[in-house]
Amino acid sequence: MKRLLAVLVGVLLAACNADDTISRAYRCSFLFDTSLHPLPCHLTSILGNSGHFCKVQTYVDNKGVRHLKTTRNYDDATEDISLTTQRETQVAFYLGANDCIIIGVSSYEIGKLVAYDGQCPNCLADYTGINYPLTWQNNGQLLHCAKCDRSYDVNSGIRSRGDAGNHDRLLTYNAFFDGTILRAWN
């Protein structure tokens, strides 16, 4: 009887989906140690500031060094961050559909950290390929897709302009900051 009860509880727990708004279509695994990159680093400076977001892209240079390229929403300033410490070089980065995520603090819910895929969810669903980048618009409060002309509110992730399409919101990832490590994942 105890075994049957344990199996039933396990099945019920496995069937539950605590947060079905988290996208799992494209892998997201991002870790950033703010103690290694103090202010004025863009990613460190957005934390605790409602309405501040960064677009984060990754690439490896010709010397094999991984870099993060960030673009802030409120002034379009860019920064190139080299990840050179032993701890950083051992982390694998997966940034959604096309190596780009948007991460920041929503101004709608004080202190709520959010992360989105940097590609248009409707174009990812409607077309082949993965290169449908979102760009800052309206002083960084909207993310716009040039392909389908849809715009999304960066604070909520909800479509604010354009046809409804298949997705009314951006592809969303978990986001958390523990005081030192900034994470986004699915």
Question: What is the role of each PLM region?
Answer:
Residues 1-7:
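Sec-dependent signal peptide recognition
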Residues 3, 106-107, 162:
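A general structural-boundary detector
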Residues 8, 112-115, 139-140, 170:
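Flanking scaffold residues of small Cys/His-coordinated metal-binding clusters
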Residues 12-15:
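C-terminal motif of bacterial Sec signal peptides marking the signal peptidase cleavage site
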Residues 20-135, 174-186:
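N-terminal pre-ligand scaffold of iron-sulfur
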Residues 123, 148-149:
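Short Cys/His-rich metal-coordination motifs, predominantly Zn2+-binding knuckles/fingers
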Residues 137-143, 151-185:
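Polybasic, low-complexity binding patches
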